[in-house]
Every structure is written in structure tokens, then in C-alpha cells.
Amino acid sequence: MYVSNCNPCAIHRKINYPNTKLDFEQVNNITEFILLGLTQNAEAQKLLFAVFTLIYFLTMVDNLIIVVTITTSPALDSPVYFFLSFFSFIDGCSSSTMAPKMIFDLLTEKKTISFSGCMTQLFVEHFFGGVEIILLVVMAYDCYVAICKPLYYLITMNRQVCGLLVAMAWVGGFLHALIQMLLIVWLPFCGPNVIDHFICDLFPLLKLSCTDTHVFGLFVAANSGLMCMLIFSILITSYVLILCSQRKALSTCAFHITVVVLFFVPCILVYLRPMITFPIDKAVSVFYTVVTPMLNPLIYTLRNTEVKNAMKQLWSQIIWGNNLCD
């Protein structure tokens, strides 16, 4: 809730970034935010509830199958599958931080989220997003070594290196999310508290702050949008160079490029721009928070014979094991 007689100008003159808990409480009178959600149409909400519940179920099942298959199959012991299992794990975690709340809100009349819950959601969203960005770079490097320098692949991508690269992804994602959250958490919010979105995101929150946030908007565009554009360009260029040197790698690179495009293009559309919001932002956010985590495991396993054979073997062991037990 927010205090209607709050004077934003007085607060802004007093302090922009509070340094103590007392100052923070004085400038922040909002304890919760109201989310307008995807739509106000009751029939559309019921339809979206069914669709998103199915998508979330498929996302969790698909990614869980990939993680279990890779971790239990000796045939999938190479670094590329180690990174793929980790990527599927992150996809499942990322989807679980957004989808359940969004699905639940489709059935509730008043969609609210506490201030601390909003900051937590913002942090987790950008944490997993940052981890996935770094992991996509790692997977591109792994693809380059495997295709262009196959004789040195197992030496270059040994267990220690793979573990270090994954640890770097975790640390990089944490630092990215921490910067984004600290950018928002100390801003003064004194009303209104209505977010025209289904999640807490940077630009909608910046618009609600009762201080000038144009500089912060530029920082977000640079830290998220420009960085995504730069990494996206590097990844696409890398895969093109791999294809130029090894045309036989077309199918492998095509799947990697598809995942990169599905991940980065929506992020670039949302963050690489001035601090303004559009109605289409919700649809774009739905795509990269709900749909993309479901598509990624399908794309990576669609024509991967080794993964499909390992899945068949796993299911055979499960079925025959159950029959033997019976």
C-alpha cells in the first residue's frame, strides 16, 4: 500500500539514495505492488491458465528428463552434454521462478506482490538470465573447440575447466542480478504502486519511483540491453565462423543459433531502448520466461541421436526394472 499524502519532491530533495535503514523507511512508503497481469478478460484468463499450466508442466518434464538422462548415461559423459544438462537445469529453475506466480494470478482477482517479494523476483529473474547468457557463451566455445580443434577437445575441456566455467556462470549471474537489484531497491517509492505487467521488471519499476530515473534507465539499457546485443553479435559471428571452417557442422550450429536467437532477441527488444514500456512487452516477456524454456530441450534433442538413444535406454531400464520387481 502507499501513502497518498506523500510529497515526492520533498523526499527527492532530502535524499536520493538512503544510506541507513531509517532513511530507507522514510522514503519508501510502498509495502506491496499490484500487478495488472496479462489481461483483464475473465475468459481469456481461464484459457491462458490452461495453456500456461500445460507449458509449465512440459517444461519441467522435458528439462528433468534431459538432466536425468545425461547424469545417468555413461555414453553422455562428454563436456557438451555436461553443459546441456546444466542449461536444462537452469531453464527449469528459471521457469519455476516466474510461471507459478503468473499462473496463480490468472485465477485471482487482485494480483499483489510484496515489496520484498518483488525485489526477490527481480533478483532471481536476472540471476538465472545472467547464468544462461554466460552458459551460452561457454557452449559456443565448447562447440568451437569440438568442431575446429577436435584433437585437443578432451584436453582443453577437461573436468576442471568445465567446473570452472560453470562456477564462472554462477558468479557472473549473481553479480549481474545484484547490480540490477541494488539499482532498484534503494530508489524511493511513494506511489502509485500499480505495475502494468505480470512480473516485477526493471522499466515498470523505474517508472513508479518518485525521483528522476532517466540516468538509471540508461544504465539498464547499457547493462542489460547493450550487453545482450554485444554478446548476441559475438555468438552469431562465432557460429558463422565455425560454419565457414567446417560446413559439416551445419546441423549442430543451427540448433545452437536457434537457441541463441530465441533467448537474446526478446531480451534485446525489452531492454535495449529508452525507459518506456509498450503493450507488446508482456507478450515478449511471456515468450522468454515461459515458452523458451520449453523449446530449448526440444531443440537440443530434436536431431541428437546420442541423447535420444540414451533416453530410450533409460526408459527401457525403468520399464524392465519395474517388470522385474513385479
Swiss-Prot record:
Example GO molecular function term? olfactory receptor activity
Extracellular topological domain: 1-46, 101-121, 180-216, 272-282
What residue ranges are annotated as transmembrane?
47-70, 79-100, 122-141, 161-179, 217-240, 249-271, 283-302
Principal localisation: membrane
Q: Name one cellular component (GO) term.
A: plasma membrane
Q: Which residues lie on this side of the membrane: Cytoplasmic?
A: 71-78, 142-160, 241-248, 303-326
Q: Which Pfam families match?
A: 7tm_4
What the entry lists under PANTHER family is as follows:
OLFACTORY RECEPTOR
Family from the record: Belongs to the G-protein coupled receptor 1 family.
Protein name (database record): Olfactory receptor 4C5
State the organism named in the record.
Answer: Homo sapiens
